Amino acid sequence: KKIGHFLPVQAGRGCPNTCKFCTISCLFKGKYLRRDIDEVMRDIEHVKSLGFKEFLLVDDNIVSDPEYMLELCRRIKPLKMRWMSQCAIQIADNEELLKAVADSGCYVLSFGFESIVKEAMKEINKTWADPDDYIEVIRKVNKAGIEVASEMIIGIDTDTRQSLDATIEFVKKSNIIAPKFYCYTPIPGTVLNKEMEEQGRISDHNILEYRPSKSVLNTPHFTAEEVTFEYWRVYEELYSMKSILKRTVFNKRMIKHPFRTLFFFGINMVY
């Protein structure tokens, strides 16, 4: 029996970037492992044969190998399916790839913006992503016909009440259709975990308590409990019904896509 609206497909694992909080970086050490495109297409075609019109490409970063992704998109396009995935902001600078991704049916990409503060990006070893570029990245991706979802972190050492207020305003003004937040978490095995252990800043070592909505790190500006409070403060502001309706139902780009509007409205309600 067909359950749901899409199924997952994977083309590759890993990411060439080495963000110090990331488990993918910890596992794959900056490497990207790709599957044979024929095998990936076999899986996508099977998803379609089961009656699904959409799939979720669960790769960690679809621009890890641009040429590979370009060829995959060319193969996907004739199937006339819709799909979702996540990638790094470099896709906005690759016009050919961005167009191919959009033309092949992709309608939403999730980006790990992490922070709008440059010093924070240095701290997490993600200097290749410049917060000054975020608005232009979103504009280019939207222009291609793809909605932008985002993932951002709360509780980096540079975070203050003022920087988090600025983050709220950034999300409100930037056309992000589905903003998601996570507390900065020292997952065992990551560079972040090693550093925080050495500094004695982890307030709870029970990994069963590690979740996006609860901080276990004390920062220069907040205790772990205060970071958790800030997390929920940001959420209450950005996930008020007024904010959800503004970026979904009353989003001008959604006028021609009523079912997509309902999908994103539902996603926001779940978040």
For each feature predicted by the language model, list its residue ranges.
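Glycine-rich beta-alpha loop elements in corrinoid/cobalamin-binding modules
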Residues: 185-189
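Active-site PLP-lysine loop of aminotransferase-like
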Residues: 182
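Catalytic palm subdomain of template-directed nucleic-acid polymerases
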Residues: 160
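C-terminal structural cap/anchor segments
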Residues: 163-164, 177
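Basic phosphate/pyrophosphate-binding loop/patch that engages nucleotide-derived ligands
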Residues: 169-178
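Radical SAM [4Fe-4S] cluster-binding motif and immediate context
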Residues: 1-149, 154-156, 165, 169
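A generic structural signal for short hydrophobic patches within well-formed alpha-helices
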Residues: 121, 192-193
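Radical SAM enzyme core and accessory elements
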Residues: 193-271
